[in-house]
Amino acid sequence: MAKTIFYFSYRKTEELHAKAKELKKITTDYGYELTDDYQKANVIISIGGDGAFLKSVRETGFRQDCLYAGIALTEQLGQYCDFHINQLDEIIKAAIEDRWLVRRYPTIYGTVNNTKAFYVLNEFNIRSSIIRTLTMDLYINDSHFETFRGDGMVISTPTGSTAYNKSVNGSIVDPLLPSMQVSELASINNNKFRTLGSSFILSPKRKLRIEIASEEGNNEFPMIGMDSEALSIQHVHEVNLEVGDRFINIIKLPKNSFWDKVKRNFL
């Protein structure tokens, strides 16, 4: 099947425009088609860093019927970008010679107040937007697990486990294990509030419900982050999360596994 490519970028600079123009020319020189409609593309390529890649996946609807690829602008390739902007010929050559490999990354599906539905590829986090703590009750499969009080929580996918989650001492999880990891942000533990005090990992058979306590404006304006986006919802009462039914198919080069990237970025 012929490859139809959609290029995504949100940084509008002269340098990026020139690089994108060069990349599009190389693409068409090798016989690939370009489209301005991402719904008609079977390959979606983001130009930028991991943030640009996450934005491209979100703005193109978390499609499962296409391939995604990330092209980095800096020497640091990141977790989602396997290619560098200065390797344009290598990118296309790898495609021509069928040296592209595809990895399937799991997602998290969630709702806010049982209405606002979303997917995340990296992480979901909820924090207080004012200088005070949040009180939340956590339920696993409708069974009460703990009452949390603190700055907030981050719930990450396996690939997202290397981001915010890692900075709060969460574990790095292999993306071959579809799951979601729940990590605390500065929890308060005393005679009244007691939490697990460590991250925990839930399987696709588990559902997590977070109920935000309604006390003294506690749930007025919490900050909600979904990958690289912020969601503004007044009066958040309940968040439901589970391992998503969608997988994102991402192009990678051989000998550049998830753990190769972890070693390159952290060791």
UniProtKB/Swiss-Prot annotation:
Top EC class for this record: transferase
Molecular functions (GO terms): ATP binding; metal ion binding; NAD binding; NAD+ kinase activity
Catalytic activity reported: NAD(+) + ATP = ADP + NADP(+) + H(+)
UniProt-annotated catalytic positions: 50 (proton acceptor)
Gene Ontology cellular-component annotations: cytoplasm
Binding residue positions for NAD(+): 50-51, 55, 122-123, 149, 151, 162-167, 186
Cofactor entry: a divalent metal cation
EC code: 2.7.1.23
Pfam family membership, one: NAD_kinase_C
Major location (coarse): cytoplasm
Protein name (Swiss-Prot/TrEMBL): NAD kinase 2
